[in-house]
From Swiss-Prot:
It is found in: Plastid, Chloroplast. Binds 1 Mg(2+) ion per subunit. Mg(2+) binds at K201, D203, E204. InterPro entries: RuBisCO, RuBisCo_large_chain_AS, RuBisCO_lsu_C, RuBisCO_lsu_C_sf, RuBisCO_lsu_fd_N, RuBisCO_lsu_N_sf, RuBisCO_lsuI. Keywords: Acetylation, Calvin cycle, Carbon dioxide fixation, Chloroplast, Disulfide bond, Lyase, Magnesium, Metal-binding, Methylation, Monooxygenase, Oxidoreductase, Photorespiration, Photosynthesis, Plastid. It catalyses: 2 (2R)-3-phosphoglycerate + 2 H(+) = D-ribulose 1,5-bisphosphate + CO2 + H2O; D-ribulose 1,5-bisphosphate + O2 = 2-phosphoglycolate + (2R)-3-phosphoglycerate + 2 H(+). It comes from Drymophloeus subdistichus (Palm tree). NCBIfam families: PRK04208.1. The modification N-acetylproline is found at P3. Substrate binds at N123, T173, K177, R295, H327, S379. SUPFAM superfamilies: RuBisCo, C-terminal domain, RuBisCO, large subunit, small (N-terminal) domain. Its EC number is 4.1.1.39. Its main location: plastid. This is Ribulose bisphosphate carboxylase large chain.
Length: 471
């Protein structure tokens, strides 16, 4: 053994395994303004104390490993380690705890959501000491959020680009999502936009399949968009999905969309990946394109209540990575979404400063220091009878997206769009006149349907449609 090796191995080093809590559980720690803070829902294995479980999470998501290593002596663990600084019991749940962990900012690469998630959730979720683990929330310090561009444009710039104010925007996903030719697809786009919608949308899995290659779809949709704009005098958009198998191909599609002069493109940010999404967001800001984000695959990550990651974390990550719209559930449609929790992460998307509010699932006060906001998109099983509730819940800075609720109209696509536009305008006018949308919503829709046969037909078709788990 060389003298150098003897020195390294002998000074202050004791080989073996020791409890994580001896190093990583620090209840006296005072968090810094520059720390990234995380709230984990921890379910320890039987016999594992909550302090050890919380410390294990802090260790395995920062500097720790399963045994002591002599190279610990070559750095300052106190400077770089994550710290579990507080643990609280989850009321009403057996053997579940909220473990609060603080991470020094130096652990993370600037401007990289990919690196942030790789560190915090990349490895620890398979840890044997834990029966289940869920990341409930993150506090992003201002010193870190300022290293991100964020959304390409944000809410106010989008309003100005579209010249549309004072109401939610209306959208529609073209159905059937797969199987249409590019020309028939473009026809549906035209009919919906001509009928009064602001946007139409590629579905998340419409990329470039044999029945409809991306370039053909882009061309026919652009033709439809320009024709509808000419006839209505309104600025229209279609979310052209640029998601592809490689980043290079994705960028090629975005470049072609810009050359066509369309206002907006789309990306599946979870299946496409945060690195690809951030690159696309930067391109969109540099080239004047709005960016619509679909959250395909989110329920794989966020649906389980005790394991995975809450969508509010994915929403914060998207605001940092970049997107002007993101799907956010409906509260009232076919997809899951609890009202207060949904409104909590909607505020995290749109607002500049959000106070801690545990009743809405917000574990930390978040200051975005003027990072542009993201417009939430309500989509999934909604129709004209939902319009009052959606207008009241989501407010003006939202996109209300009716796929089947437009294309399923008994008279066709354009009448379906007319029905939705009439219903929305009626709800906005009623709200502005001081009427209570929550209490008078159905009456408002019935009144409007008396002078709109398209709305009356839609009301009749969907009058008894509900998405209850007991059906």
């Amino acid at each position: 053994m060389s003298p150098q090796t003897e020195t390294k191995a002998s000074v202050g080093f004791k080989a073996g395994v020791k409890d994580y809590k001896l190093t990583y559980y620090t209840p006296d720690y005072e968090t810094k303004d520059t720390d990234i803070l995380a709230a984990f829902r921890v379910t320890p294995q039987p016999g594992v104390p909550p302090e050890e479980a919380g410390a294990a999470v802090a260790a395995e998501s920062s500097t720790g490993t399963w045994t002591t290593v002599w190279t610990d002596g070559l750095t300052s663990l106190d400077r770089y380690k994550g710290r579990c600084y507080h643990i609280e019991t989850v009321v009403g749940e057996e053997n579940q705890y909220i473990a609060y962990v603080a991470y020094p900012l130096d652990l993370f690469e600037e401007g990289s959501v990919t690196n942030m998630f790789t560190s915090i959730v990349g490895n620890v979720f398979g840890f044997k000491a834990l029966r289940a683990l869920r990341l409930e929330d993150l506090r992003i310090p201002t010193s870190y959020s300022k290293t991100f561009q964020g959304p390409p444009h944000g809410i106010q710039v989008e309003r100005d680009k579209l010249n549309k104010y004072g109401r939610p925007l209306l959208g529609c996903t073209i159905k059937p999502k797969l199987g249409l030719s590019a020309k028939n697809y473009g026809r549906a786009v035209y009919e919906c936009l001509r009928g009064g919608l602001d946007f139409t949308k590629d579905d998340e899995n419409v990329n470039s399949q044999p029945f409809m290659r991306w370039r053909d779809r882009f061309l026919f949709c652009t033709e439809a968009l320009y024709k509808a704009q000419t006839e209505t005098g309104e600025i229209k958009g279609h979310y052209l999905n640029a998601t592809a198998g490689t980043c290079e191909e994705m960028m090629k599609r975005a470049v072609f969309a810009r050359e066509l002069g369309v206002p907006i493109v789309m990306h599946d940010y979870l299946t496409g990946g945060f690195t690809a999404n951030t690159s696309l967001a930067h391109y969109c800001r540099d080239n004047g394109l709005l960016l619509h984000i679909h959250r395909a695959m989110h329920a794989v990550i966020d649906r389980q209540k005790n394991h995975g990651m809450h969508f509010r974390v994915l929403a914060k990550a998207l605001r940092m990575s970049g997107g002007d719209h993101i799907h956010a559930g409906t509260v009232v449609g076919k997809l899951e979404g609890e009202r207060e929790m949904t409104l909590g992460f909607v505020d995290l998307l749109r607002d500049d400063f959000i106070e801690k509010d545990r009743s809405r699932g917000i574990f930390f006060t978040q200051d975005w220091v003027s990072m542009p906001g993201v417009i939430p998109v309500a989509s999934g099983g909604i129709h004209v009878w939902h319009m009052p509730a959606l207008t009241e819940i989501f407010g003006d800075d939202s996109v209300l997206q009716f796929g089947g609720g437009t294309l399923g109209h008994p008279w066709g696509n354009a009448p379906g769009a007319v029905a939705n536009r009439v219903a929305l305008e009626a709800c906005v006018q009623a709200r502005n006149e001081g009427r209570d949308l929550a209490r008078e919503g159905n009456e408002i829709i019935r009144e409007a349907s008396k002078w709109s046969p398209e709305l009356a037909a839609a009301c009749e078709v969907w009058k008894a449609i509900k998405f209850d788990s007991n059906q």
